[in-house]
From Swiss-Prot:
It comes from Dictyostelium discoideum. Disulfide bonds join 29-92, 38-85, 76-125, 118-138. Residues 1-20 form the signal peptide. Residues 572-587 have a biased composition (Polar residues). It is found in: Membrane. The gene is fslP. Residues 539-587 are annotated as: Disordered. Its main location: membrane. Keywords: Disulfide bond, Glycoprotein, Membrane, Receptor, Signal, Transmembrane, Transmembrane helix. Glycans are attached at residues 43, 61, 96, 101, 152, 180, 232, 288. This is Frizzled and smoothened-like protein P.
Length: 587
């Protein structure tokens, strides 16, 4: 259906002159120009030129049409060329008549293509004729009711009151010259002939028509793709660095990993893994292209399968652990803790592995014209929805729910005990959750925009294809819509790891973790750097659980004394999952 829509666009542009419903008489017999594309395809030399028509313009129009027939099929093309030549350059018959006053008058008449010739072309070209070449239908008629493709002959009547009344019967033209070259499809560069390049059993070829495929690489946004790639690489590198820092801080250095730390650690791991898939692709030019001309990589190309699995696993990991972070924040704002965290852990990781492996079993990991190796849905299948979008929407729904509930709890907390420090920390976490929610929502919503604009994309490709069929491809530029949204999508996806760093990586507790890390102290001691790099001494207070402001013992003690008046902010706990509350932090 996509190929059909594409052809409708380009043929409607070029076949306007064929759609004339008038047969104009009073024309002239002209020699078929050697520059005519039909010069070698007709067995006569004179054709009927309608009054007002130009031979030069006629030659150009027919040449453009024949070039566009490269987008049809080997069965249709030669028959369509033959029919178009007979219709555009009808054989001219001259009738010389003598009037009653002994004056001679000449009548030039066209010999129209026979219906039998039309039927030969109609069968292989039926889909094209029915949809956009209706005037080439064998039942078509001129505006005066005369058949365009007569069965045997056409009657022409000329009357002049009191002077003459002539009737002429002109037999139809059944000329057929088979040209072997006419059946060869010559796809205009940079398109490739599917007959020469499509390998049986291989997939991920993109057909423009039944005979022509896109070459690889193919840029939807020419001249802008490199800008997107560089932006994506830069932002992803920043995100990777911040995620790596979060992994060190909450997964390697802590003396004890709490539930909140594990959630942040899992999210950061997902960000690093997602970035890794981009780094693998960036090591190879035109990564999406296979070694076979015109074929985009599919799951049979192991590197494409690997990057697809890595990206899917990393993206789903970050998406699934984002609501867990929000849930932990919501529970903490209620001065409680998560029960049965181990069950959540098992459930989330199991679902992540299943959703990553499922498309692989269906053979759906492949590159496309617009995306790198991931789940391919060009065939309209539901693999992307089942394996990514629906689970992601569920996760985003939970993220939204817990963010709203957290806002309510924080507002109640502030109303009872106003504290700007607590409010600032809570607002920072809430804003981080909202940014994550926006990023994930925008990234998933872009799919619906792209699908809604699919016809617009094919219109743009149609204009581009018309251009390359006429002349130098380097002068033809594809103007596809949606570049701004595509660029914004690159940004929002690339900064996911950086967002979680802003929310949790800049908390004062991070400094505390690094200072109190026994692993870091051991490394410094082994390297002989412990005398040069002094870490803070480990506190013996069992109530040092907030850590959201200040790092000295005096500040922590002051914080404990004030705990009955105002609960501290739900920051990242270094010893347990309960912040200091009105029981002085005792659990």
């Amino acid at each position: 259906m996509k190929k059909l829509n594409f052809l409708i666009c380009i043929i409607n542009i070029l076949f306007l002159f064929v759609n004339s419903q008038d047969l104009k008489l009073g024309g002239s017999c002209e020699l078929i120009d050697s520059n005519s594309p039909c010069f070698s395809k007709l067995n006569y030399t004179d054709f009927y030129l309608q009054p007002g028509d130009s031979i030069t313009q006629l030659n150009k129009n027919v040449s453009d049409i024949i070039r566009m027939l490269e987008f049809t099929t080997p069965e249709c093309k030669p028959n369509a060329i033959n029919l178009i030549c007979l219709k555009s350059y009808p054989k001219c018959e001259t009738h010389n008549e003598t009037l009653s006053n002994n004056t001679n008058i000449i009548f030039n008449l066209p010999s129209l293509p026979c219906n039998s010739i039309c039927l030969i072309a109609e069968t292989p070209c039926k889909i094209f004729i029915d949809n956009f070449l209706k005037d080439l239908s064998c039942s078509s008629k001129f505006s005066n009711g005369v058949p365009m493709f007569p069965i045997n002959s056409t009657d022409f009547e000329f009357k002049e009151s009191g002077n003459f009344d002539f009737n002429f019967n002109v037999e139809c033209n059944d000329n057929i010259i088979y040209d072997n070259s006419s059946s060869v499809i010559n796809c205009p560069a940079p398109l490739l002939n599917s007959k020469d390049h499509v390998i049986p059993g291989k997939t991920t070829y993109y057909y423009i028509t039944d005979s022509c495929i896109l070459d690889c690489p193919f840029e939807i946004y020419p001249g802008k793709t490199k800008i997107l790639d560089k932006t994506n690489y830069t932002l992803t590198s920043i995100s990777f660095i911040t995620c790596f820092f979060m992994i060190l801080t909450f997964g390697v250095l802590p003396n004890k990993i709490t539930h909140r730390m594990e959630s942040i650690l899992s999210f950061a791991c997902g960000g690093c893994i997602t970035a890794l898939s981009l780094f693998i692709q960036s090591r190879q030019d035109n990564f999406n292209c296979s070694s076979d001309p015109g074929r985009f990589k599919s799951q049979s190309d192991y590197l494409c399968l690997l990057t697809g699995l890595i990206f899917q696993f990393g993206a789903i990991t970050s998406i699934f652990w984002a609501p867990m972070i929000a849930y932990d924040f919501y529970i903490t704002s209620r001065l409680s803790k998560i029960r049965k965290f181990g069950l959540y852990r098992i459930g989330i990781w199991s679902l992540i592995f299943v959703l990553t492996a499922l498309p692989a079993f269906g053979g759906k990991y492949s590159a496309t014209v617009a995306t790198s190796c991931w789940i391919n849905s060009d065939d309209g299948s539901a693999w992307q929805y089942i394996s990514f979008y629906i689970p992601s929407w569920c996760a985003m729904g939970l993220l939204c729910l817990f963010s709203i509930l957290s806002v309510i709890n924080v507002s109640k907390m502030y109303m009872k005990s106003p504290n700007r420090r607590i409010l600032f920390f809570n607002i920072k976490i809430i804003i981080t959750s909202l940014i994550l929610l926006f990023n994930l929502t925008f990234a998933s919503s872009l799919k619906f925009y792209m699908e809604d604009k699919m016809d617009t994309y094919f219109d743009a490709i149609a204009v581009w294809a018309e251009c390359i069929s006429k002349g130098d491809p380097s002068q033809c530029e594809l103007h596809a819509p949606g570049y701004e949204l595509k660029a914004l999508n690159v940004v929002v996806v690339s900064i996911l790891g950086f967002c979680i760093f802003i929310g949790y990586g800049l908390d004062p507790i991070v400094i505390q973790i690094w200072k109190e890390s026994e692993k870091l102290k051991w490394i410094l001691k082994k390297c002989g750097l412990n005398d040069f790099i002094k870490l803070g001494s480990e506190t013996t207070s069992t109530t040092n659980t907030s850590g959201s402001s200040g790092s000295g013992s005096e500040k922590r003690q002051s914080k404990i004394r004030m705990s009955k008046l105002s609960p501290p902010p739900p920051s990242i706990d270094t010893t347990n999952d309960i912040p200091i509350n009105d029981t002085l932090g005792e659990n």
